[in-house]
Amino acid sequence: SPELFRHLEVPEQTDLWIAYDYRTLGFEETFAPYKEVHLVAWSLGVWVATRLWAGHRSFTTATALNGTPFPMHDTLGIPTAIFEGTLHHISEEGMRRFNRRMCGDKETFNRYSELSPRPLEEIKEELESLYNQILPEKLESADPRISAFWDQAILSTEDKIFPATNLRNYWQGRCPIQEIKAPHLPFYHYQSWNELWK
């Protein structure tokens, strides 16, 4: 939810849009009034942003953070068995385990746990919708514009959702990579949005 990003400073004269509910994909807004538009996509949002905008880029910068355009893939994303296991075990206890892995350490987990949780049914609908759209995609038939879309990738070396090795496998040779010592949820390691798009 947008609460997760509340601590990040927004530069002056900057509008911030946060897209986070992926039960249906679509973005009807226009970027036309803006001189600069910086995209930061996190986790499965990297796949969503690629899907929505890879063919018609209108961004000053595009940063992929702890995700790839192939989010369910044994060597380039979340291993298929883990993705499916997460989907099939969405419950309060299952989400608690997932959140622990996502947060990586107790301090991050405690801070994240203070936020209002999204309704479990909403999370399940979202993950099922994404799974059904991701499942038929094949690496061989990928749109070649995907590789040129992203300006940089930031990957967390302690990511327990998207293995760092898989993130490296995908991003190596496609764009500059910045590695940070952080869990899958890296936002508490930053103070400002412009740290993510510089």
Residue ranges and their predicted role:
Residues 147-148, 153-155, 159:
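Short beta-strand/loop motif that positions the catalytic acidic residue
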Residues 161, 178-197:
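Catalytic histidine-centered segment of alpha/beta-hydrolase-like enzymes
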Residues 111-140:
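Hydrophobic, aromatic-rich cap/lid helix
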Residues 55-89, 126-131, 190:
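Flexible "cap/lid" loop of the alpha/beta hydrolase fold
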Residues 71-114:
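Helix-rich cap/lid subdomain of alpha/beta-hydrolase
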Residues 40-49:
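Gly/Ala-rich beta-loop-alpha elbow adjacent to hydrolase catalytic centers
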Residues 1-26:
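Conserved HGGG/HGGXW glycine-rich cap/lid loop of the alpha/beta-hydrolase fold
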